[in-house]
Regions:
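Short acidic (Asp/Glu) and glycine-rich catalytic loops that position anionic groups and cofactors
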Residues: 12-17, 85-101, 129-133, 150-169, ...
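Short beta-alpha connecting loops at secondary-structure transitions
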Residues: 19, 73, 103-107, 135-139, ...
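Generic beta-strand/beta-sheet core signal
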Residues: 50-53, 69, 89-91, 151, ...
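Long, charged, mostly alpha-helical binding arms that flank functional sites
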Residues: 83-148, 158, 276
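Catalytic alpha/beta core of large soluble enzyme barrels
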Residues: 70, 76-77, 122-127, 197, ...
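Active-site cavity-forming subdomains of large catalytic enzyme subunits
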Residues: 1-93, 97-108, 131-135, 188-190
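Internal maturation/activation junctions in enzymes
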Residues: 21, 114-137, 141, 162-226
Length: 277
């Protein structure tokens, strides 16, 4: 995948390899393929891109002695070893603001409390979960991976009046995720003091990283698509922009006209809202 992304940056062709022999068997234009991937993902949600090389770097696979990551969780957000599974959960960022109007800002204190509670919740869920196979129970109990994600990021930007495709939005995303990662690790360290580190800790790369990484869970965060749970929480999905200001959602029995509440709020503030619109 790294070779493809470098080719895409250069807008050049990339090689196709025979999986059996490893020999080059053709080439394709990287930009044409990437544009097609983006178009089809927008139309129906597939395909996604799996970075096989990144899946097995030090951060993604802290237990290389136990094997390589060869699969993912159902939505592709989490690299996993053979037979492994992971408990996922997401924080609704749009509920972590303080102030009003132009004085609104991210409430990091509240976000920190939520992250600590969420890590404990996900570790509890790992403990109570049932497993269909012995191999799955052993590897999950051994690594205790959890995936704390986010949703409502686009909603957060709406309320802060920050354009989604701006450098300011990217900087805020980086600041938020760095904070979540830091607090998630702190919470996992607290759990390790109470309940012990994960069973495979001594086989992991974290063992030699010092006290900061003496944690309950081998891995902590993810970026899940949250397509379904964001509907339940009435917020924008994951880190994605909204699908549309207004659209028709169809189910097996009903059709729903959905209008983005933040657009409606601005329309009323600026006095251009109407039912006909």
């Amino acid at each position: 995948t790294t070779e493809f992304m470098h080719a895409l940056k250069r807008r050049s062709d990339y090689n196709l390899y025979d999986p059996r022999t490893g020999e080059v068997c053709g080439t394709l234009n990287s930009k044409r393929i990437f544009d097609l991937i983006g178009l089809m993902a927008w139309k129906n949600g597939d395909p996604g891109i799996v970075f096989l090389d990144r899946m097995n770097n030090e951060r993604s696979n802290p237990t290389p002695n136990l094997g390589v990551c060869e699969t993912t969780s159902p939505c592709g957000e989490y690299p996993l070893l053979a037979y492994e599974s992971v408990i996922l959960g997401s924080v609704n960022l749009s509920k972590h603001l303080k102030g009003e109007g132009s004085a609104r800002e991210v409430d990091f204190e509240k976000l920190g409390r939520t992250v600590h509670l969420a890590v404990r919740f996900l570790d509890d869920a790992t403990e109570l979960n049932g497993f269909p196979l012995r191999q799955t129970r052993e590897i999950v109990s051994g690594n205790r991976k959890i995936g704390l994600s986010i949703m409502g990021f686009a909603d957060l930007l709406f309320m802060l009046r920050i354009p989604y495709n701006s450098r300011k939005a990217l900087n805020l995303a980086e600041k938020i995720m760095e904070y979540i990662q830091t607090e998630a690790r702190a919470s996992s360290r607290e759990l390790a003091k109470e309940r012990g580190v994960f069973l495979n800790f001594d086989e992991s790369l974290l063992k030699d990283k010092g006290a900061e990484y003496k944690q309950r869970n081998a891995t902590l965060t993810a970026i899940s698509p949250t397509g379904t749970i964001s509907l339940v929480a009435s917020c924008s999905p994951s880190i994605e922009p909204i699908y549309g200001i207004s659209f028709l959602r169809k189910t097996a029995r009903f059709e729903f006209l959905e209008v983005n509440p933040y657009f409606e709020e601005v329309a009323k503030e600026q006095v251009f809202y109407s039912e006909e619109m």
